Swiss-Prot record:
Keyword terms of this UniProt record: Cell inner membrane, Cell membrane, Membrane, NAD, Quinone, Translocase, Transport, Ubiquinone
Pfam families registered for this protein in UniProt: Complex1_49kDa
Record SUPFAM superfamilies: HydB/Nqo4-like
UniProt name for this protein: NADH-quinone oxidoreductase subunit D
Entry membrane topology: Peripheral membrane protein
Length: 403
């Protein structure tokens, strides 16, 4: 037979090509506006191409034309699942450059609300990831608890989601004692809900089949792709900025860093469950310390507004208040990198200041961006149904990825 006519001799079986499908951007398991172009060989993922940018708002560029204080609310809109953790990094960067010492009471409040944010995030992640693999009950329980935490946000600053509560030099206002009592009471009752979720998922045969040995990440991959947070700890590395590079007063707190062993979706789930228990312990310690720590919650100076009582009696205070909210404070020239252990990983701010009242450049390091980069590598060879499980444990939220 002539070689050029070989095509005719191929059977239908031999002519099968790989099949391309779009996963998202309006898919319920896509966690926001993620679009994955998947190349499938039957049910097996051969290639996974993430398309991002559908929620891009140009945050980093917008920040260059706003004062430092006006930029703070942008951080609530990055990872909108746990907003205060992002504000924290911005405040730390400004405080590093200006050399401001945050009062102890403000540091404790920041730690308290950062840990509440961590539980907010993990509750949403664990329960919705369970829903992605077929368990419909946990999200209902998780949202019930998140509602209570949202009310604690609201009682601290007036907003449920976009808080703008952390300020350079401290926090906006002090917490009433009743709020601390209520958070303490909630922290005593919450373990029961965790035990319920634990009982429903941890030893559940179907949940384990859908998560064990899926999306395995090795120590080598972590170094190559720049992972952080639970993606690192799920593979057995005890890397946590709260321990490795303590900020605020985390070095005073007694807590463990949970680590996994296999680096798969199931281990990442277990790490998040244990992290919530550790956060509860930190919350209770912070409340105990707050009952003893008295004093102001803002470092009074050029960065922060004067007390209302002073403004009514002192002309200088009134002028300072007016200048602060019209022109804003000036940050000395320099560059700094400040990072916090956000619920999703290392959230960092690289800030370049030129001595004016606006940042010259602010680069935001979103942990989810680096995790999503590895999606092709992690998903290759898995089945189509496993893609949802992998995205879920990567903890993708598009506000911070697209910025």
């Amino acid at each position: 037979m002539d070689g050029s006519k070989f095509d005719d001799a191929q059977t239908g079986e031999q002519k099968i090509r790989n099949f391309n499908i779009n996963f998202g951007p309006q898919h319920p398991a896509a966690h926001g506006v993620l679009r994955l172009v998947l190349e499938l060989d039957g049910e097996i993922v051969e290639r996974c191409d993430p398309h991002i940018g559908l929620l891009h708002r140009g945050t980093e560029k917008l920040m260059e034309s706003r004062t430092y204080l006006q930029n703070l609310p942008y951080f609530d809109r990055l990872d909108y699942v746990a907003p205060m953790n992002q504000e924290h990094a911005w405040c730390l960067a400004i405080e590093k450059l200006t050399g401001v010492e945050v009062p102890r009471r403000a540091q404790l409040i920041r730690v308290l609300y950062s840990e509440i944010g961590r539980i907010l995030n993990h509750l949403l992640n664990i329960t919705t990831q369970a829903m992605d693999v077929g368990a419909l009950t946990p999200p209902l329980w998780g949202f019930e608890e998140r509602e209570k935490l949202m009310i604690f946000y609201e009682r601290a600053c007036g907003a449920r989601l976009h808080a703008a509560y952390f300020r350079p030099g401290g926090v906006h206002q002090d917490l009433p004692d009743e709020l601390l009592d209520d958070i303490d009471l909630w922290a005593m009752e919450f373990p029961k809900v965790m035990d319920d979720i634990d009982g429903l998922l941890t030893e559940n045969r179907i949940f384990k089949q859908r998560n064990c040995d899926i999306g395995v990440v090795t120590e080598d991959d972590i170094q190559k792709y720049g992972f952080s947070g639970v993606m690192v700890r799920g593979s057995g590395l005890a890397w946590d900025l709260r321990r490795a590079q303590p900020y605020e007063c985390y070095d005073e707190f007694d807590f463990q860093i949970p680590v996994g062993k296999n680096g798969d979706c199931y281990d990442r789930y277990l790490v998040r469950m244990e992290e919530m228990r550790q956060s509860l312990s930190i919350i209770r310690q912070a409340i105990a310390k707050l009952r003893e720590a008295t004093g102001d919650v803002l470092a009074r100076g050029k960065l922060t507004p004067p007390k209302r009582g002073d403004m009514k009696t002192s002309m200088e205070s009134l002028i300072h208040h007016f200048k602060l909210y019209t022109e804003g404070f000036h940050v000395p020239e320099g560059e700094v990198y400040a990072a916090v252990e956000a619920p999703k990983g290392e959230f960092g701010v690289y800030l370049v200041a030129d001595g004016s009242n606006k940042p010259y450049r602010a680069k935001l390091r979103a942990p989810g961006f680096l995790h999503l980069q590895a999606m092709d590598y992690v998903a290759k060879g898995h089945q189509l149904a496993d893609v949802a499980a992998i995205i879920g444990t990567m903890d993708i939220v598009f506000g911070e990825i697209d910025r």
